[in-house]
Amino acid sequence: MQLNPSEISELIKSRIQGLEASADVRNQGTVISVTDGIVRIHGLSDVMQGEMLEFPGNTFGLALNLERDSVGAVILGEYEHISEGDIVKTTGRILEVPVGPELVGRVVDALGNPIDGKGPVNAKLTDAIEKIAPGVIWRKSVSQPVQTGIKSIDAMVPIGRGQRELIIGDRQCGKTAVALDAIINQKGKDLICIYVAIGQKASSIMNVVRKLEETGAMEYTIVVAASASDSAAMQYLAPYAGCTMGEYFRDRGQDALIIYDDLTKQAWAYRQISLLLRRPPGREAYPGDVFYLHSRLLERAARVSEEYVEKFTNGEVKGKSGSLTALPVIETQAGDVTAFVPTNVISITDGQIFLETDLFNAGIRPAINAGVSVSRVGGAAQTKVVKKLSGGIRTDLAQYRELAAFAQFASDLDEATRKQLERGRRVTELLKQPQYQPLQVWELAVSLYAANNGYLDDLDVKQVLSFEKGLRESLKTSNADLIKRIEDTKDLSKDDEGALRSAIESFKKSGAY
């Protein structure tokens, strides 16, 4: 069949007129491979680092590797239905999670989707999970305390609002217990808590949530869970999602506390993603930017000035500074704190609480090693009464540890050395504390006062904790006004000190312990 040129031109003209051109300017590419949640895409020429990508079946991914002729992306969620040849579209957006007071009391995943079976989270706002930390100009120095209710921490390693304090130790030595006690102790203290569980067993996360509900702590807590059964991408993103939720409160002049339990598992997840993306491995097979992974997260915890809050809220909130306090947890292997991730996080944070398996097994719980645990900025935030009384405790313990090592070799000890050893044993006993029983400021002050002034020296070591408990009960019944004054002023005046001394002496004479 022969077509003349006029017929061809007519045919082309009719085809052009019948063409329906859609105004979809989004860039798109094709999947060339899918392995372990990592997708290689060809043809996405106009894509940003960290941009959300849309896959078939309402599935989204995150662009992480931008190479010359392909893009490496990680899938958020299930990826079994994605196959070679599928069309991928750019969205022009970066990953956001819901934020706001609607999340308080809920358990959500790394993307802010509820997983507690209590219906949808009706959050009105969303915010980007990757944000730049406030600059130096907008920050304030740490000056208000975060009371953990744990004697050894509040006395020797105090934490302030806006601080980053690392909790580090081997597995099964009480790291999560310390973090949970800190959350439980915030009841009535106007502090929103966020607990980010990374790479833990789902049953362990459930136990944490149950305990928080039993103690009434879920009323002011958000739980962000990326369990061991979730993908590496979810475990990598969970801390950033939790941090964004905490920043909502910080930027509006409120105080928040965030616990990352634990960042070792996040580093493992990031290492897995990086190796699958074929990024060059470095020390311990971690990628080169594993320091930046944690520094950009922990730098977002800060105390921000009143000017910052006023500017952020467009003048709605005035005269209020906000804070986000971070307690990252790091798990060590056989006590090795010189490994890559522990040394990185130690250098980023404002101090660390070392927990030791040997102390834990010896029955000293919380198993805090007072000698190497420090708080670089928390001293300025300590309450007056605790600051006044805690100096002696740290010295007693440090001298006791030193002398105890020598005492093993010496057979005859002089009187002063023996007294110091005896005092040290009693202080060590006094700092033991059962889980889920955080103390108020006045209770800590009374215990420290009794230890500093020698009221425990003539007791048997086994009687120390029963004496402490009995003394607290006695003060509650007969000296309620004294307790109220200490709790209100957070200080111990000369008159109150005299009243406390006589109360302790009369209780000791009664022998009711």
UniProtKB/Swiss-Prot annotation:
Task: Spell out the residues of the site Required for activity.
Answer: S373
Q: Which UniProt keywords apply?
A: ATP synthesis, ATP-binding, Cell inner membrane, Cell membrane, CF(1), Hydrogen ion transport, Ion transport, Membrane, Nucleotide-binding, Translocase, Transport
The entry marks the following residues as binding ATP, namely G169, D170, R171, Q172, C173, G174, K175, T176
Where in the cell does this protein reside?
Cell inner membrane
- An example Gene Ontology CC term for this record: plasma membrane
Q: How does it sit in the membrane?
A: Peripheral membrane protein
Entry keyword annotation includes Nucleus: no
- Give a GO molecular function annotation for the protein: ATP binding
| UniProt xrefs under Pfam families | ATP-synt_ab (PF00006), ATP-synt_ab_C (PF00306), ATP-synt_ab_N (PF02874)
**Broad enzyme group:** translocase
Q: Which family does it belong to?
A: Belongs to the ATPase alpha/beta chains family.
Which HAMAP family does this chain map to? ATP_synth_alpha_bact
What is this protein's function per UniProt?
A: Produces ATP from ADP in the presence of a proton gradient across the membrane. The alpha chain is a regulatory subunit.
Protein name per its UniProtKB record: ATP synthase subunit alpha
Q: Which organism is it from?
A: Burkholderia lata (strain ATCC 17760 / DSM 23089 / LMG 22485 / NCIMB 9086 / R18194 / 383)
Supply the gene name.
atpA
